[in-house]
Amino acid sequence: MKIQNIVLVILLMQTHLVIAQQSEIKSVTTSHKNGTLMVIGGGKLDSTIFLEFKKYAGGDTSRIVVIPTALPDDYLLTDSAMFHIRKGFEKYGFDRVTILHTRDTVVANTDEFIEPLKTATGLYFLGGRQWRIADGFLHTKAHKEMFKLLDRGGVIAGSSAGATIQGSYLARGDTETNQIMMGNHEEGLGFITNIAIDQHVLARNRQFDMFDILKNRPELLGIGLDENTAIVVHGDEFEVIGASYVVIYDGTFWSREGSSLKNLPMNDAVFYMLKSGDSYNLRNRKVIVE
């Protein structure tokens, strides 16, 4: 009987170890090993961010696809919508621009629809409501082609809703309002794993909203981007560019001046900010200090 009890204890310990290891694996945050991601916080963007996108897309030889699906139909169906979208990129020297839009996953699964993605060097998601992108593209052939674009060393960028959709967890994914952090759409396109991404954070005083997600999904890394600010992601690391700040929710605190004497809140209620030039390791969830 004692031997059976010992065996049972050992089996339970091994089971708990496997579960813990699986949990640890699931909570690893990283992006695609190839290519570049640009996650942009929305608002009016300086030319610096667009030119950075152009650089990673191949400069003057770039071939980009623009996905405006996050925008509402009452805009997209106007006669001038596609003209203005195209002009917005042409003024930065993008000569080969394809606008790709659907709200139908059947269409997004057709070879004809995904053809422009097969030769694209860059992809850009416009802002609006991120759940619209999920409805049209999630788990389709078009979605798979986006990963292949990264495999080729291309760049995927997106601003506002186009930022949030790049994460694995879809923040503000409710169809009724953007004020609900955990809505009826919770899955993003997953270019970065185990992450929730918010935007317009400081401009709209959203810096505390991320905790609504993290108290229910504590394994996630939370990132909030302010307007005219972006992170440029390569593999496990990103660098901040732009005019404002990126808010980090990783359960720790970091400051250039140190934090040992600061009276900080509990780990589940703390955040800190990074500015242009700062770098962060997603896998380790730590600021990179040179």
Predicted regions and their residues:
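Catalytic-core regions built around general acid/base machinery
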Residues: P116-T119, K141-G153
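Bacterial Sec-dependent N-terminal signal peptides
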Residues: M1-S27
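Short internal beta-strands
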Residues: V65-T69
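Structural motif
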Residues: V39, G122-L126, A157, I197
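Glycine/threonine-rich flexible loop motifs
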Residues: Q130-H139
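C-terminal and late-domain segments of enzyme folds
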Residues: Q21-D60, L71-F83, K87-R96, L170-R172, ...
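Short beta->alpha junction loops
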Residues: I99-V106
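Catalytic nucleophile loop
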Residues: F125-G127, M146-L170
